[in-house]
Amino acid sequence: VILGLVAAALGFAVLAFGGVRIQEFLIVEGLVGASAVIWLIRIWTVRDHRLLWPPVCWAVLAFAGWAVWRTLQADVQYVAWAELIRILTYTTLFFVSLNNLHRQSTAQFLTWFLVGLATLLCFYGAYQFATSSNTVWGLDRGEGYTHRASGSYVCPNHFAGLLEMLIPVALAIVVAGRIKPLGRILLGYCALAMLAGLALTLSRGGWIAGGFGIFLVLVALARHRDYRWAALASIALLLIVGGTVASKTRSLQKRLAVADDLNPQARNTRPMIWSAATQMWRDHPWLGVGPAHFAERFKQYRTHWVYAEPERAHNDYLDGLADWGIAGAALVGTTWVLFAVGGLRTLRQVRRDPGNLETKRSSRYTFVLGALCGLAALLAHSFTDFNLHIPANAMVAVALLALLTGFSRYATDDGWVSSKVPWRPLISVVVMALAGVLMWDTWHRGQETSHFLKGRRARDGSNEQIEALLAAWKVEPRNAITALYLGEAYRVRSWAGAEGFEKLAEEAHGWFQRAALLNPYNPIPHFRSGMCLDWIGRHDDAAPFYDAALKVDPQGRITSFHIGWHHLQSGDPIKAREWFLRSIDQGYPPYAPAETYLRLIDRDRTPSSGR
């Protein structure tokens, strides 16, 4: 049952846009919580149940506790809570998988399941690439990803993150695994399909990371006498095929030639985002700005070269330092170090000695080697992207970590702990707490999300929208986004000239202020409050709210535009023109509304030539 729940959670997360949307992640969270409940039952019903608790478990538990403490101190509680729930979901998945799925057969099942699923998604990605389809399961994924394979993910880079973890596992088993000929052929085709899918993502970071993982696997196998020729042949084949495809495919050549993502002089590029993340960490070196607070605080740190609002730093290491500080990063780093030490020790133990007369194959060795190299590839990709913050990829990585840690029992018996007193009650309390939090949150945020999405689908400013958003607010009054949308609904109704528009504007102003209190780093509630007051002629009262928006977003082109709009409403077109020009300068292509208003001002100031 636990294996089915874990497989369902992993598979659904991969298929459902990587689990990035709240409505899909809640299902994943519920499945993981249910698996913890089943484990809790097993702890008390299986008489000889033992707990597998190697040293890395203490580091995992310590970081989970640290995340709880930091969440209680966070400036934006709702955002921090959502991040905490993700961390607790991964923590639960790790402990459940480690203590219930440590058999070799379960590792083989999950390997085939994930590799098979990724292979099917590569065919879907090939369709996206060949037809220039820009949708995922019928939903638009954005113009920037046209003619790139992303499978069931929105971003091709994150699909590459999944593939780079699984290709080394499949390749190691094909070359050196103890497997029947038919299975070797099928898995070989899967490996080739995933390699093709990785190429079609056009993710340069994915190519480098995937190549790194494959290189580690094949070099490790080439050092083993029994696998040397097969590994060297694989290296030669991959180099020949890869070079031929790259030289004959224009889209691959074009992607290699375009490198603006790392150009420090270009706008909206990774170096610009990394600079902001670095400064954020320097200002909060020990504790960071808070769980998942990078996006909330980014506007204060960006330069006029960056008009985008990235959710993450496009570098998991900088993102971790910015969010968690040195203390949190040290806990995460300790976890990875303990895992690496244990994994390498296990690898040495499960490796078979070279045979004198025949090749000795080992499924344990190939899985451990492939999974280690796949995780190394993911860590390499983390220097230029945020795959560890994509739930599906994070969960696959956690599952591999748990399975590898479970294989440590082949290296030592030190990790086993009897489930007698006091361990059984203690671990039961931990599992009960994790399962209880996840199941409660699934129900609680499930209700909120249902009402909120209903409000999003309704017509702007309609009674239906306001009723749905109020219902969501009643369930969860900490969500600044709900308050923001309620304010916007009342503002739209007021600006439509509805009866009592002044009271509606004041109602909107009140909701915007609630949103600003819940998330003081978002400029939108501030300048929307000012717009409501401008609408009813209270220009002097509106000015402080635009100042507040500018304080939290000093280089934002949308904020600059709204300040210009305020000056225009106040009867100062000269000041408005200055802010519209500033807005235009803060982004490329220039902000279209600012250009429109600037043309209107210049047209009105130009005297009629007459004839």
Show which residues each predicted segment covers.
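Transmembrane signal-anchor hairpin modules in multi-pass inner-membrane enzymes, especially those
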Residues: V1-L88, T92-G116, A172-G188, F215-L239, ...
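Hydrophobic alpha-helical transmembrane segments
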Residues: A64-T71, V96, S105-R141, V154, ...
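A membrane-periplasm/extracellular boundary helix in multi-pass inner-membrane enzymes
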Residues: F123-S132, D140, A196-L202, G206-G210, ...
